[in-house]
Amino acid sequence: MTLLALGINHKTAPVSLRERVSFSPDKLDQALDSLLAQPMVQGGVVLSTCNRTELYLSVEEQDNLQEALIRWLCDYHNLNEEDLRKSLYWHQDNDAVSHLMRVASGLDSLVLGEPQILGQVKKAFVDSQKGHMKASELERMFQKSFSVAKRVRTETDIGASAVSVAFAACTLARQIFESLSTVTVLLVGAGETIELVARHLREHKVQKMIIANRTRERAQILADEVGAEVIALSEIDERLREADIIISSTASPLPIIGKGMVERALKSRRNQPMLLVDIAVPRDVEPEVGKLANAYLYSVDDLQSIISHNLAQRKAAAVEAETIVAQETSEFMAWLRAQSASETIREYRSQAEHVRDELTAKALAALEQGGDAQAIMQDLAWKLTNRLIHAPTKSLQQAARDGDNERLNILRDSLGLE
């Protein structure tokens, strides 16, 4: 059994590739079924966010394993293998465990130490358990990563300052508009990222927020919290002209806001500027919108400069966190090695118990037939000793014949011989 982590993220691939490799929530079950149908895959978890798509797998070693998994990923998303290979990373066993712990702890995020990723990792794990999870080692790896992430946040200052993609989007808005209290903000979506954006905006005294979402119920809960109006996605076209700032983050596979829609809104606004921050993958706003005069479009990749400004205060904490991850990875791998030996131990114990039961049954039968008890017990002890030491004796003899002193010493140590 081998543990693997493979995928792409914001550091290795542009948003144009990340959106093509992402797994939409409504097709995740189908993707997991297809993945687990691969003969080498014992268990799998798919993590797909704005900034990364990763597969965490428990697999049987085989020739061309990497080729087979890359081919599956490319076939599933209809990708050119060469395009994917340039951006794909591949971690195995110790490195896979360490990578997951770093991801869950926010150490591999666009925003160092951001807490949202832990919730996303947990959701990916829960989704994988709905009839898909098969490998206990993979399950244990995820459970361990959750406890490590909690330890990192408790024992370091990695989350001391409020920095996230949502926070960066709000920072960008504050840089462009002198005061947010007089602007109208349209939020598209009602997921976790938009929730964070809405709360940040409320803290900065935004008076008018409109939330457009596919389902009204979820949007209404957030709207009640931040004092916003709720509209349907179909109403965006007619209401877009009211918005000075549009921040969008949905799971839609196709753009929601097109160039024509923004052109009409700008005309109605007499070309007053609009800021559009698209933090969705795949993108919610057509890239061509950025070519329009007075439409200022930013993607998740464009937020990098803002986010970079906030990294300094977290770097010292990250060093401490990396030490924790290294320690916890080492402990987990020790547990994993012990698990791999446990089946051998069970087999060895079962074999010894079988010999014991077989010889004891024969001895008891001999006693019932009136045999001499002392002779029967001596015979039992002799046969039991010979049967139990037969295999170790053969191994010692073979090691001696081969002149393999290292193996001989290992066997001596295993048998408790000084």
Swiss-Prot record:
Q: Which InterPro entries match?
A: 4pyrrol_synth_GluRdtase, 4pyrrol_synth_GluRdtase_dimer, 4pyrrol_synth_GluRdtase_N, GluRdtase_CS, GluRdtase_dimer_dom_sf, GluRdtase_N_sf, NAD(P)-bd_dom_sf, Shikm_DH/Glu-tRNA_Rdtase
Q: Which Pfam families match?
A: GlutR_dimer, GlutR_N, Shikimate_DH
Q: Which SUPFAM superfamilies match?
A: Glutamyl tRNA-reductase catalytic, N-terminal domain, Glutamyl tRNA-reductase dimerization domain, NAD(P)-binding Rossmann-fold domains
Residues bound to substrate are: 49-52, 109, 114-116, 120
Q: Tell me which EC number(s) this protein carries.
A: 1.2.1.70
Q: Report the PROSITE patterns cross-referenced here.
A: GLUTR (PS00747)
Give the record's keywords alphabetically. NADP, Oxidoreductase, Porphyrin biosynthesis
Superkingdom of origin organism: Bacteria
Give this protein's Gene Ontology molecular function annotations.
glutamyl-tRNA reductase activity; NADP binding
What CDD domains is this protein classified in? NAD_bind_Glutamyl_tRNA_reduct
Q: Where is the active site?
A: 50
Please name the pathway: Porphyrin-containing compound metabolism; protoporphyrin-IX biosynthesis; 5-aminolevulinate from L-glutamyl-tRNA(Glu): step 1/2
What GO terms describe the biological role, i.e. biological process, of this protein? protoporphyrinogen IX biosynthetic process from glutamate
Q: Which reaction does it catalyse?
A: (S)-4-amino-5-oxopentanoate + tRNA(Glu) + NADP(+) = L-glutamyl-tRNA(Glu) + NADPH + H(+)
Q: Where does NADP(+) bind?
A: 189-194
Q: Where is this site: Important for activity?
A: 99
Family membership, please give it.
Belongs to the glutamyl-tRNA reductase family.
The protein's role, per its UniProt record: Catalyzes the NADPH-dependent reduction of glutamyl-tRNA(Glu) to glutamate 1-semialdehyde (GSA).
Domain remarks in the entry? Possesses an unusual extended V-shaped dimeric structure with each monomer consisting of three distinct domains arranged along a curved 'spinal' alpha-helix. The N-terminal catalytic domain specifically recognizes the glutamate moiety of the substrate. The second domain is the NADPH-binding domain, and the third C-terminal domain is responsible for dimerization.
Q: Anything else of interest in the record?
A: During catalysis, the active site Cys acts as a nucleophile attacking the alpha-carbonyl group of tRNA-bound glutamate with the formation of a thioester intermediate between enzyme and glutamate, and the concomitant release of tRNA(Glu). The thioester intermediate is finally reduced by direct hydride transfer from NADPH, to form the product GSA.
Q: How does it assemble?
A: Homodimer.
- In Swiss-Prot or TrEMBL terms, this protein is called Glutamyl-tRNA reductase
Organism, as annotated: Shigella flexneri
Lineage at the top is: Bacteria, Pseudomonadati, Pseudomonadota, Gammaproteobacteria, Enterobacterales
